[in-house]
Amino acid sequence: MPTIQQLVRSRRIQIKKKTKSPALVNCPQRRGVCTRVYTTTPKKPNSAIRKVARVRLTSGFEVTAYIPGVGHNLQEHSVVLIRGGRVKDLPGVRYHIIRGALDTGGVKGRTQGRSKYGVKKPKAEK
């Protein structure tokens, strides 16, 4: 426990919290342009082909972002919106692409959890 005199001499240092998504620079989302769209495999013990994109952001960063959902329409030079959120079994992937925003289309035929995949409410059939 420091004395009052020690605190007068040098105040207590604040512990700085390290952000998990530095490329967003304190913004909820960021716009970017896809520089490469490719697939990759997860680390053990999982097995799949995950769709990811390399994105150059307006903040100047180049990041790897995950493309959620079944099927996508992204290609090089597509303008996308990214949010934070890592993919646990893909090392280095700390961002998600938001479906249904800018050039990214929603997931076709999705009826549940639609808001997360950019799908409008289907027309009620008679």
UniProtKB/Swiss-Prot annotation:
Location of this chain's protein in the cell: Plastid, Chloroplast
GO molecular function: rRNA binding; structural constituent of ribosome
Region (Disordered): 104-126
Main location per the UniProt record: plastid
GO BP terms, alphabetized: translation
A UniProt-annotated Pfam family: Ribosom_S12_S23
Biased composition (Basic residues): 111-126
Keywords: Chloroplast, Plastid, Ribonucleoprotein, Ribosomal protein, RNA-binding, rRNA-binding
Gene3D superfamilies: Nucleic acid-binding proteins
GO CC field: chloroplast; small ribosomal subunit
Signal sequence, renumbered to the chain: none
Domain of life: Eukaryota
UniProt entry tagged with the keyword RNA-binding: yes
Protein family (similarity comment): Belongs to the universal ribosomal protein uS12 family.
Assembly notes: Part of the 30S ribosomal subunit.
NCBIfam families per UniProt: rpsL_bact (TIGR00981)
Function noted in UniProt: With S4 and S5 plays an important role in translational accuracy. Located at the interface of the 30S and 50S subunits.
Protein's recorded name: Small ribosomal subunit protein uS12c
Source organism (scientific name): Phaeodactylum tricornutum (strain CCAP 1055/1)
